[in-house]
Amino acid sequence: MKKLLPEELPLPPLPELVKGVMANRKELNMNDIVGTHDILFICLDCLRYDVALAEQENGGTPVLNRYGLWEKRGAPGNFTYPAHHAMFAGFLPTSLEPTPMTKKKMLFFPKGIGMGRVAPPKAFAFDEPTFVQGLERVGYKTVCIGGVSFFSKRSALGKVFPAMFQQSYWKPSFGCTVKESPDNQIAKAIEVLEETFVKERVMMYINFDAIHYPNYFYLDGVRKDSLESHAAALRYLDACLDKLFSAFKKRGQTFVIACSDHGTCYEEADDGYLFHGFNHEAVTTVPYKHFFL
């Protein structure tokens, strides 16, 4: 009988998954990770927490489910541009549990800014404008695979985020109007990894925009975006991720940050709220997890 690899094993029932994740969860020291691990930051742009949770529970995202449960967190912005400025500065989606400012846990910390200007002891502290550039300073090759138009480099605004990285890539086939955009983005990511020495540490950011509007084409015979097509886009993206994770595993140890930057609305409450760019519970509540490959 063939021995199954860990990634081929069936997902345990959700209560057992919860138990296992909580039992093995430890507070991270990013100073032990930086320099020894590749770092992969994937943003599932526009993903709602409630949809992520539903797909997690019904088994619609088997790849992501292997790496623990989504946490319910607060978005750092209500659309892509402000959210990414915050995240690249180290302010990732935050816990919704009441926590004093000075006791908040951070993976990356900008020196001299807030929280008493003292870095949490287990955070990677940096002087640069972004933690991406902070990682570059300590020897990382930094790579951006763009998705939505804020990463397209086709306008002055679309060049701001790519300029934070040593290497940045975008082409129309990575855009949110292309159903196969995650396949195309991952193909480019793997190409970059194959051109990189194994001993060279990589920090890669990918802005997956499959879930961003329009997403109706992930359901047959549909011409309008909805919560159902939002979920279908997430399932499509999840099925693509195994190739990406396998490529990183070949290089050695990898630390992964996976989250949404903001959620979105579909007028499902007949309240007139459509998409995002405003404060609404569906927009400001996002899924987050980090894990090791």
PLM region spans:
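Catalytic domains that recognize anionic headgroups
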Residues: 1-293
